[in-house]
């Protein structure tokens, strides 16, 4: 299997992703001639980056889908030994300014989630990074019900942003998706709008999928595979 080459079709991408299943991160790193970090404290994005590299993703840090020519976003999911997600899933940054006129249909959240290639990764802390296994890939698009849940949450959360009610946003808002600060530290500051329409400085906010939502995606895939 040729790694690090951009796939030309959805079928080719899925075949390559499924070929990775069963390898450890250490084995994949060896094939790509790269070093596995001793821990992920300073390399939090390493797992996602090595999977992107192996599959030939080209977006990098650009705000587009990882396989824009195929309309597919790549997401790794760290899972425990029971196959359950260990953390929420980052979707994209929230537009804190210049957000007038954005609808669900034109939102970056819908763009990112319309077609997703999920790659489960074993991530129990007791297991060394190099020994963690890559799981079977899942190519997913939201069902009608899932999209309605996402849309409802997006519209509710965006209302807080547009009305300048950032101080009222907390992790409890949203059924399947939440808004949380995105930044390595308190020095990560961006522009936003307050309730009076004035520009202020605040922490960047990002949309995240809640763990039960991604757990359901994994569970549905397993049931269909049986």
Swiss-Prot record:
Keyword rRNA-binding attached: no
Top-rank taxon: Bacteria
SMART domains assigned: MutH
CC per GO annotation: cytoplasm
InterPro entries referenced in this protein's UniProt entry, alphabetically: DNA_mismatch_repair_MutH (IPR004230), DNA_rep_MutH/RE_typeII_Sau3AI (IPR011337), DNA_rep_MutH/T2_RE_sf (IPR037057), Restrct_endonuc-II-like (IPR011335)
Transmembrane regions listed in the UniProt entry: none
Gene Ontology biological process terms in this record: DNA modification; mismatch repair
Compartment(s): Cytoplasm
Alphabetically ordered keywords of this record: Cytoplasm, DNA damage, DNA repair, Endonuclease, Hydrolase, Nuclease
SUPFAM superfamilies documented for this protein: Restriction endonuclease-like
MF term (GO), any: endonuclease activity
Subcellular location, principal: cytoplasm
Function according to Swiss-Prot or TrEMBL: Sequence-specific endonuclease that cleaves unmethylated GATC sequences. It is involved in DNA mismatch repair.
HAMAP family the record matches: MutH
Family of this protein: Belongs to the MutH family.
Record's protein name: DNA mismatch repair protein MutH
């Amino acid at each position: 299997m040729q790694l690090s080459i951009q796939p030309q079709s959805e079928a080719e991408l899925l075949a390559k992703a499924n070929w990775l299943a069963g390898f450890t991160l250490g084995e994949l790193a060896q094939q790509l001639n790269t070093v596995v970090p001793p821990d992920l404290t300073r390399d939090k994005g390493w797992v996602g980056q090595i999977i992107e590299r192996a599959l030939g993703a080209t977006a990098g840090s650009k705000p587009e889908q990882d396989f824009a020519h195929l309309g597919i976003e790549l997401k790794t999911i760290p899972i425990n030994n029971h196959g359950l997600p260990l953390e929420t899933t980052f979707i994209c940054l929230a537009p804190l300014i210049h957000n007038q006129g954005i609808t669900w249909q034109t939102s970056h959240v819908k763009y990112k989630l319309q077609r997703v290639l999920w790659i489960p990764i074993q991530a129990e802390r007791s297991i060394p990074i190099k020994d963690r296994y890559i799981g079977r890939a899942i190519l997913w698009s939201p069902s009608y019900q899932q999209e309605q849940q996402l849309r409802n949450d997006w519209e509710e959360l965006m209302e807080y942003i547009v009305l300048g009610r950032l101080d009222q946003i907390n992790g409890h808002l949203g059924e399947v998706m939440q808004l949380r600060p995105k930044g390595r530290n308190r020095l990560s500051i961006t522009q936003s709008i307050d309730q009076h329409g004035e520009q202020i400085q605040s922490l960047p906010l990002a949309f995240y999928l809640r763990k039960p939502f991604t757990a359901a995606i994994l569970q549905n895939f397993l049931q269909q595979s049986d």
